[in-house]
């Protein structure tokens, strides 16, 4: 986008990009500790409060899921940025096991010098993604802000028996991931200035593949993976998933750790499926991808699945053109943490 003769790069207007702008999990825990207490959440209609992907409230025989997600640009194209933001915002509803999103309140932060037509392109991308996923913007809020921001407050509905949380993980479960890792590193590659490109041993063809693969991942809705899970469950006539989350700013190990902590189990991650070349690039950029903490934007679902049904689940995911990586397993009860296996394998996609 251009302002007069000046080329506008959204990513140059911020210091942190996408889900990397989020508060670290330990600081987030400290922030809310003692402010929202257990007593505040005693209402029997609050089925899920803090610490999950969305809150779940029971009303008139249905459950309402509520979540909010807002972040900074990770790409320069405002339309694509809008689609990524909508994908990320809606994902937390799907990560609770619910398919029906009844509306989205768009939230936009606008720097004073950012042309309004750029903001309109972001909103257009956001709304187009919503339409593609059977929902719509129903309202929202805008503010003037030093950094551009876009996201939404999302409401989903469903039945109580459909809800999946981070707390249901069982010993013996396998963990299935529905998107590769490495979006943080891939998009950092896209921001390398022209004068420094020669310092990185990578062809233009490889660079384009890495960046386009990341954008494809960040604009692919987790709705498709959840629908595949439901189809697999219909096929076997039983529940397959014991727990569910999505992989975003805390990385695969950070989000696995939340599942392990909430379920009081030990999870071992033994596979890191990554976008091509991002493992070596992550070392160069100082990202924690190979430690399991690479910040993902609009990452995949992480499904804690019953081992006896994993082949059925993988088959339905692949039929839906989703990735299906078996990335770990639940080793034992107790400990309440996730760890990388000593012989963790890294594969490139």
From Swiss-Prot:
Positions that bind Mg(2+): 53, 92, 246
GO cellular component term, pick one: cytoplasm
Keyword ATP-binding attached: yes
GO BP annotations, alphabetical order: selenocysteine biosynthetic process
Superkingdom classification of source: Archaea
SUPFAM superfamilies linked: PurM C-terminal domain-like, PurM N-terminal domain-like
Record's cofactor remark: Binds 1 Mg(2+) ion per monomer.
Residue numbers annotated as active site: 19
Entry keywords, A to Z: ATP-binding, Kinase, Magnesium, Metal-binding, Nucleotide-binding, Selenium, Selenocysteine, Transferase
Its EC number(s): 2.7.9.3
Gene Ontology terms for molecular function: ATP binding; magnesium ion binding; selenide, water dikinase activity
Broad EC category: transferase
InterPro entries the record matches: PurM-like_C_dom, PurM-like_C_sf, PurM-like_N, PurM-like_N_sf, SelD_I, SPS/SelD
List of residues binding ATP: 22, 50-52, 69, 92, 140-142
Pfam families tied to this protein: AIRS, AIRS_C
The reaction(s) this protein catalyses: hydrogenselenide + ATP + H2O = selenophosphate + AMP + phosphate + 2 H(+)
Cofactors required: Mg(2+)
Site-annotated residues for Important for catalytic activity: 22
Quaternary data: Homodimer.
Functional summary from the UniProt entry: Synthesizes selenophosphate from selenide and ATP.
HAMAP family, A to Z: SelD
Similarity section: Belongs to the selenophosphate synthase 1 family. Class I subfamily.
Name of this protein: Selenide, water dikinase
Native source species: Methanocaldococcus jannaschii (strain ATCC 43067 / DSM 2661 / JAL-1 / JCM 10045 / NBRC 100440) (Methanococcus jannaschii)
């Amino acid at each position: 986008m251009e302002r007069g003769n000046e080329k506008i790069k959204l990513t140059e207007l911020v210091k942190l990009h996408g889900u990397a702008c989020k508060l670290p999990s330990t600081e987030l825990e400290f922030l809310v500790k003692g402010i929202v207490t257990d007593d505040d959440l005693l209402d029997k209609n609050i089925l899920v409060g803090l610490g999950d992907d969305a809150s779940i409230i029971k009303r008139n025989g249905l459950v309402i899921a509520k979540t909010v997600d807002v972040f900074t640009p990770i790409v320069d194209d405002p339309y694509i940025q809008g689609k990524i933001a909508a994908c990320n915002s809606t994902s937390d509803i799907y990560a609770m096991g619910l398919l029906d999103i009844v509306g989205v309140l768009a939230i936009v932060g606008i720097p004073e010098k950012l042309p309004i037509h750029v903001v309109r392109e972001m909103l257009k991308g956001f709304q187009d993604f919503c339409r593609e996923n059977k929902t719509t913007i129903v309202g929202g809020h805008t503010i003037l802000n030093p950094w551009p921001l876009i996201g939404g407050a999302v409401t989903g509905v469903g039945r109580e028996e459909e809800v999946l949380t981070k707390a249901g993980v069982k010993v013996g479960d396998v963990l299935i991931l529905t998107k590769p890792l490495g979006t943080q590193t891939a998009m950092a590659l896209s921001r390398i200035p022209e004068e420094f490109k020669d310092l990185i041993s990578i062809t233009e063809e490889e660079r384009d593949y890495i960046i386009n693969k990341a954008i494809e991942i960040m604009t692919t809705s987790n709705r498709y993976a959840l629908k595949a899970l439901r189809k697999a469950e219909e096929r076997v006539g039983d529940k397959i998933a014991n727990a569910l989350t999505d992989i975003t700013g805390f990385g695969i190990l950070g989000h696995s750790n939340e599942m392990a902590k909430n379920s009081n189990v030990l999870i071992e991650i033994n596979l890191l499926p990554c976008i091509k070349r991002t493992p070596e690039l992550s070392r160069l950029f100082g990202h924690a991808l190979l430690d399991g903490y690479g910040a993902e934007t609009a990452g995949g679902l992480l499904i804690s699945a019953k081992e006896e049904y994993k082949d059925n689940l993988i088959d339905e995911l692949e039929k839906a053109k989703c990735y299906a990586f078996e990335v770990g397993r639940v080793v034992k009860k107790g400990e309440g943490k996730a760890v990388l296996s000593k012989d963790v394998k890294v594969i490139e996609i």
